[in-house]
Amino acid sequence: MKLMMYSIKMRSAKGGPHEEGGKHISGAERILREDEIEEELINVYRRAITHEKGKPDFINLKIEAIDEDKILYKKRLNIIQHKVSSKEEGLKLAKELLIKNTVSEEAAKEGISSIQKLKESIHGAMLLDKDSGKRIDDKGIKGVRVTGIASADIKKYKESLKRDGREGLHLEEALILASKIASCKAIVAELCWSDDPSYVIGYVGTKENYHRIPILKDKGNPVGGRVFFVDTSQLNDNYTLEDLIDYLEKQIVLIE
């Protein structure tokens, strides 16, 4: 008998629910067979209550069945590890990588500045025109939330990262997320760094590669964010900005 697939989503906050002004602490998403759910629920709960940003007083867990006929399978990005010795070097490298991937210098600078200017972490992503650097979504501080994403085989995925000497929850989740983003039509590149205060590593995602950059912010900085650079010339009546956002927010994608 074929086992059903389920989406598990967790979000936690301190000071009440997010909708009532609670401060976001952590979140997670998994797509699992029904026989994997019980064990992973424990892991997700532990993540919620042990996060470095504090212990939440609100934890929301959501479990939904998935229609397997609607799942898309996409390839994983290649990991390229870079070396830098300072935040300034890291940001300079990020800008260069973005420019090499058809983002204008003006838009690359605006993308970096957009994250640096945040007073609190944006929940989703900001969408910028790759040429002008102008923000093209209207989601405000919520941003565009990328959901419906997981590894097609989490055990094999973790084993492959371990063989490459690249273990760690941040990398596991970021690489899967970046791979879905790269598969989205009209998005040419992504810039991201974490809001976890002690985690200063960030990345530039392109259509083929995940460029891991060791330092993109100061240690102790609790603000992070992500920017997607969009080739607006690919948007038209048959593929609109709304279609692009729907793919990111709603389409179930498993990464192979």
Curated annotation (Swiss-Prot):
<keyword id="KW-0067">ATP-binding</keyword>
<dbReference type="GO" id="GO:0042410">
    <property type="term" value="F:6-carboxyhexanoate-CoA ligase activity"/>
</dbReference>
<comment type="subunit">
    <text>Homodimer.</text>
</comment>
<protein>
    <recommendedName>
        <fullName>6-carboxyhexanoate--CoA ligase</fullName>
        <ecNumber>6.2.1.14</ecNumber>
    </recommendedName>
</protein>
<dbReference type="InterPro" id="IPR005499">
    <property type="entry name" value="BioW"/>
</dbReference>
<dbReference type="GO" id="GO:0000287">
    <property type="term" value="F:magnesium ion binding"/>
</dbReference>
<comment type="similarity">
    <text>Belongs to the BioW family.</text>
</comment>
<comment type="pathway">
    <text>Metabolic intermediate metabolism; pimeloyl-CoA biosynthesis; pimeloyl-CoA from pimelate: step 1/1.</text>
</comment>
<dbReference type="GO" id="GO:0009102">
    <property type="term" value="P:biotin biosynthetic process"/>
</dbReference>
<dbReference type="GO" id="GO:0005524">
    <property type="term" value="F:ATP binding"/>
</dbReference>
<keyword id="KW-0547">Nucleotide-binding</keyword>
<keyword id="KW-0460">Magnesium</keyword>
<keyword id="KW-0093">Biotin biosynthesis</keyword>
<keyword id="KW-0436">Ligase</keyword>
<dbReference type="Pfam" id="PF03744">
    <property type="entry name" value="BioW"/>
</dbReference>
<comment type="function">
    <text>Catalyzes the transformation of pimelate into pimeloyl-CoA with concomitant hydrolysis of ATP to AMP.</text>
</comment>
